[in-house]
Amino acid sequence: MDTFPSLFLYSLTIQNSNYVQSSCAASLSGKKAQEIVIATESRLLIYKVDATDGRMNCILNQNCFGIIRNVAPLRLTGFKRDYLVVTSDSGRITILEYNVEKNKLVPIYQETFGKSGIRRVVPGEYLAIDAKGRAAMIASVEKNKLVYVLNRDSEANLTISSPLEAHKANNICFHLIGLDTGYANPIFAALEVDYSEIDHDSTREAFTSSEKVLSYYELDLGLNHVVKRWSKVVDRNSYMLIPVPGGNDGPSGTLVISNGWISYRHLQKAFHQIPILRRQAASANAISTPWNQVNSNSANDGPLIVSAVLHKMKGSFFYLLQTGDGDLLKLTIEHDGQGNVVELRLKYFDTVPLAVQLNILKTGFLFVATEFGNHQLYQFENLGIDDDELEITSLDFQAQDNEVGTKNVHFGVRGLQNLSLVEEIPSLYSLTDTLLMKAPSSGEANQLYTVCGRGSNSSLRQLRRGLETTEIVASELPGAPIAIWTLKLNQTDVYDSYIILSFTNGTLVLSIGETVEEISDSGFLSSVSTLNARQMGRDSLVQIHPKGIRYIRANKQTSEWKLPQDVYVVQSAINDMQIVVALSNGELVYFEMSDDVEGGQLNEYQERKTLTANVTSLALGPVQEGSRRSNFMCLACDDATVRVLSLDLYTTLENLSVQALSSPANSLCIIPMNVNGVSTLYLHIGLMNGVYLRTVIDVTSGQLLDTRTRFLGPRAVKIYPITMKNQNTVLAVSSRTFLAYSYQQNLQLSPIAYSAIDHASSFASEQCPEGIVAIQKNTLKIFTVDSLQDDLKSDIYPLICTPRKIVKHPNFPVLYILQSERNFDSFKYAQENGDVGSSYTKEKQNEHTSKSWVSFISVFDMISKKIIHESPLGDNEAAFSMTAAFFKNRDEFFLVAGSATNMDLECRTCSHGNFRVYRFHDEGKKLELISHTEIDGIPMALTPFQGRMLAGVGRFLRIYDLGNKKMLRKGELSAVPLFITHITVQASRIVVADSQYSVRFVVYKPEDNHLLTFADDTIHRWTTTNVLVDYDTLAGGDKFGNIWLLRCPEHVSKLADEENSESKLIHEKPFLNSTPHKLDLMAHFFTNDIPTSLQKVQLVEGAREVLLWTGLLGTVGVFTPFINQEDVRFFQQLEFLLRKECPPLAGRDHLAYRSYYAPVKCVIDGDLCEMYYSLPHPVQEMIANELDRTIAEVSKKIEDFRVRSF
């Protein structure tokens, strides 16, 4: 009996989440340069900042296969570079070293200290490092603290001790830092509360009298022991600690942050405190910041500091503290040089988006890891020393006095003055809904429309696969060229001098300078069409045309190689020293250049090779440094073959290998590319049928190996060599344009986000050193590829407040975005000002109540790419659901929005629910409200259903039809225990998702207008989204980051669909206090992100459909079904070997990670499989041998799944 699963999936991440869990500035490369280290949920990224233009370049993106909790730099005295200390859910503290040569993080130590997972008593939530790198303390939220002593051995290698315990039962830790004590014993400061009495007091008196304590834990390096050295009661509202530089740099100690106050405390040192500056209630010069519109501090509460960063300079230091409104405050500490603080000074600095973490680089950059929206890099323009901003001092505020009194502590918000924005890193957090559709303008590539963000920092984003480009020049030409080249005049030139444009009846030469203009003294024949052109030798140029070859020397002297009247050139190829041409009579002619005479000359090889098929393309390999010729050439013929010929001195034009193709080749290119640190010679082939091939040429034998295939589009593929980012790349032009390049030592093929082009060439000038010049019909264009790091381009369209749902018009390219926000004033204020968007971002920032709501629908035109209409909902309405439903009784589509009036999120109650029905006008660009219906619950889910509408109102599933004035209820079922979050429909089958109790299958019986529940899940799942994969199979996600597939048993499915089965379904005996039948679990996988949307789509033309999912943190991934069992067994074995040979970076067990809440089932982790590329060659070879494959075959298998998926 075959027990092999009928469903097996391959999980692959398309776009990683960029939500920052932790970040730091560190010198990992040891070259006196600083990098920014970003820890997302499961990845470590290293960014290098270019000091000249502020561009952030990602040099490393490494998957840890675990949940990262904290990351911090560590450097012992005398070391030249930093290590990284990482805490995660692995139950281990990990110390990583950055290997510059291999460009990877390598674990030095993985010290186990406790259980895996994230628990309140497992250390790792807090991480503190001694300023001199001598010790590290990790702490849990409750009870446990561990100290590790760090040292060096006799060979100057880092060593780590066994952990020293500093546990205390019934103790909650709120924050932990390492103090700067110079070379004295390391001290760690913790903010703690002892709840031993609170836990046993039912009167709550112990709670009201409890005290928050600042405790110092000292590590005695001599005795190798940790003791609590000092404790001091602090304000109960204290929540954050900031270390103060010590030793020769400052007075040491800690800053204690509480609600509205900053205080300085240290051992036997004077106490100082200063209030946190507040915004003026209504400032004449105040500007709005879109990140502080929601949850701003009320006038009665003191400001809260949410993040802080210390910057040391020679002889001084200062802090930047960020409030909950996004305002940066500059704090300086004046001290007497003897370890005593004189005063604290505080002033307003600038306003930036709300940050999870702030990092300052020594080169003068501030990195803001934002909570919502794109992360930002700022450059310091000033330090705020000589400005007119109000500066307050702690000398004006008496110790232990927590009342501001009448003193002026208010400032007015202004635009950026001390900082300037130089770079952004895209982030999709928080991603709430997604739609995949074909773009109306391109008609070629699927595009992803997402709504993300919170408050006025929300946006609609159009994601499409493609490297981002910048257009520099677009100029019309007198005709449509058939080819283009750029030429240098000398072999050593850095920049190009000529652009050669070939037309059907002539050639145009343009000179490149400050401007591009036509010239006539280049030596090129302008009366003929040019087939090929290139700079050869030291300073010569070559023009190949149908009737021969024109050789142009530096002094403009020319020589010609001419053909007889009835013979002409059909194809040609040129490199630095060689030329090969294919003639119309079937002959192949080969030339070599000699530098024996001044200016060089071309020497024809006397034996011509006769071919039996017509040549469609030729290619010559590059001439290596120190060599006089390339040893290989390739030719493609119309018999759908490609051949490799020898150009060796003794075997010239002899066949070395041949490969059959699926279609005649249209274009060839031989170019070396760097893969895994090794230069490999590749042959790139573009076929007539739109297929692109890449194959390796064995430099010893000339054999063609390891062929990779990709369908690019319906047009024939043209191949152009391009120099990009100091590497050899290849441009493949079809109906879309793709770039083949090497990124992080792996070959990638990505589309470029640019309109379709016809011909292209490299372009280098002083203004544009690495560009591409292209022909688009009769237009000359010059553009650049901005970065090779991210091949998912994002276009951003700002929204007013938090988006909830996105819906497309059934027939027109129009999107409808449902938005709602808590803590906003009535929407009427925006209408009175005449501009919805600006009113919410420019006025009345702090005038809101804690339970007020605003909701409206924005209409987005996908053609003009802007919001063209906004329709507000009623006062204090919270909107959650929307759908475009077809009502059969009206024979047209309507937009229906579901909302709740006076919604209380904590209690999940409301005055009443609402249905608002809108009619489409002007091809969906305008909405007309035609119906408003009040209902008795909160409509959390809406979907069209057989000419009517299904609504999930609380725990009830209802059928509604559109009446003349109201929505009419036509049927109802108490479908779930709590409340419905999602509804999926196929034919008469309905799947309803409950907030806690997984999903239930419902069947609709139209004969009796009955809804019947007939199957549900065996366990509880907190479902967030789901989609029907087929009639019986459902894919869903839950709030804990799992994606799963459930299938209704075949006999149960048939029973539910049978006619007259209603009575049997009603009277069947319940099983496990629920429905009579249970769903079977087919697959289960932990993604480490909360799925917010699932769609069954086809992302690659000609490939199978996949499951596309997006997560709240911004992750985009796919699940691809396996076609045969052989592939499943191959990847299962590969996954097993990789778990053993490539253990996760932070020490987490991979199988346990992917089985976080339930065992992983019938899913292969494609992200782990792709780690095969980064393994050393001996390990790759060992794994390939275990699989009875070659390294190339294993790599091809892995690559094929990514190609077929996205």
UniProtKB/Swiss-Prot annotation:
Organism: Schizosaccharomyces pombe (strain 972 / ATCC 24843)
GO molecular function (one): U2 snRNA binding
GO biological process: mRNA cis splicing, via spliceosome; mRNA splicing, via spliceosome; spliceosomal complex assembly
Name of the protein in question: Pre-mRNA-splicing factor prp12
Keywords attached to this entry: mRNA processing, mRNA splicing, Nucleus, Spliceosome
Stated role: Involved in mRNA splicing and G2/M transition.
Keyword Mitochondrion (UniProt): no
Subunit structure: Belongs to the 40S cdc5-associated complex (or cwf complex), a spliceosome sub-complex reminiscent of a late-stage spliceosome composed of the U2, U5 and U6 snRNAs and at least brr2, cdc5, cwf2/prp3, cwf3/syf1, cwf4/syf3, cwf5/ecm2, spp42/cwf6, cwf7/spf27, cwf8, cwf9, cwf10, cwf11, cwf12, prp45/cwf13, cwf14, cwf15, cwf16, cwf17, cwf18, cwf19, cwf20, cwf21, cwf22, cwf23, cwf24, cwf25, cwf26, cyp7/cwf27, cwf28, cwf29/ist3, lea1, msl1, prp5/cwf1, prp10, prp12/sap130, prp17, prp22, sap61, sap62, sap114, sap145, slu7, smb1, smd1, smd3, smf1, smg1 and syf2.
GO cellular component: nucleus; U2 snRNP; U2-type prespliceosome
Gene that encodes it: prp12
SUPFAM superfamilies: WD40 repeat-like
Compartment(s) where it occurs, according to its Swiss-Prot or TrEMBL record: Nucleus
Family, as annotated: Belongs to the RSE1 family.
Lineage of origin: Eukaryota, Fungi, Dikarya, Ascomycota, Taphrinomycotina
